[in-house]
């Protein structure tokens, strides 16, 4: 992939500095690049560095707007600490011919390492033996398809039915972005055009709970549809499977999960059912343990998939995923938490805090106006997150009763730590 050493990023830094507000933090990036453009923007950067104006670039949470006028969706980036945890949430426009059918998808990073990945593109850039170094056919049959991303696929078809012209007409709508508090940062957006008749509303929050070792990510995908559909909700994790709290069967031989729209490239390695209303799936990646805790229904199917089917030239990575399949469903909520915890040392060969701190995750309220999710830890302490689903202002007051208890707040959401 690209880095800030590429010529295009040298151009971007110099132009942004010269024509922007001359942010001195950009100068530190230019110093690392050790290269400037031979024009007035590059000269301005060089003079700024010469005069000692450079400052360290601070990576902070930011909402980047898409489109010529900044009104075609965007990308929300939530960060905790010094890149301790970084969430990249996409609610942008199609992205011209490079665009993927990946509305409301996201990637998650831990100190720069991928935790939940976006596959990216199917191309070995400038490696002649691989399709001349150009885009491979799998870029269209896999990488662009919705099922290749951490987002919702309906009825095994991609967003906009995989049609570029249709996708180019629409973009997702930001509900709100709030990174004003370090311990609770939230981004929320809606998509109403990817599947006609279906509304997807995804809210992602980066939260630091006092009883937990690390910050965690709360993911609420609210789906509204008058029709009965099959929903597939994958998590493309990076690492080695450690544990899960459900039983599954592995087939004697691997067969593709489907025939088209990317499904033809996925092998089904395991299939099971939830053993409880809270399903957990853990893995180890880059020396850190991660647990996905998700609220499941008894009828859900839990799938373990592996990329690589219908790939005789080995153009695709053999990446794995955990997938929730929910059939014959209209309105529903997928509520999940991704929790980093503990570590494993290959030097001492010791593991620490390898178990999740979460005992239960539950959708305790859901209607058109509000969705509430509770997180209960193993000590019985309960945290509560309530989302106002309708577009509202920071000043709007809300009142809701859940289980006989009343909650009042102002703004887009309510959150209370245990």
Q: How should each PLM-predicted stretch be described?
A:
Residues 1-5, 16, 67-70, 100-116, ...:
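Ser/Thr/Asn(+Pro)-rich, low-complexity disordered segments
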Residues 17-18, 24-254, 330-332, 336, ...:
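Catalytic and substrate-binding regions of extracellular carbohydrate-active enzymes
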Residues 31-33, 39, 326-332, 338-418:
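Non-catalytic terminal regions with compositionally biased, polar/charged low complexity
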Residues 82-87, 197, 303-316:
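Active-site-adjacent bridging/hinge elements
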Residues 190, 277, 281, 369-377:
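Short, hydrophobic/proline-enriched secondary-structure or compact coil segments at domain edges
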Residues 235, 288-309, 332-343:
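Short, hydrophobic/aromatic-enriched beta-strand segments in well-ordered soluble domains
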Residues 236-297:
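Polysaccharide-binding surfaces and accessory modules of carbohydrate-active proteins
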Residues 313-332:
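A surface-exposed beta-strand-loop module
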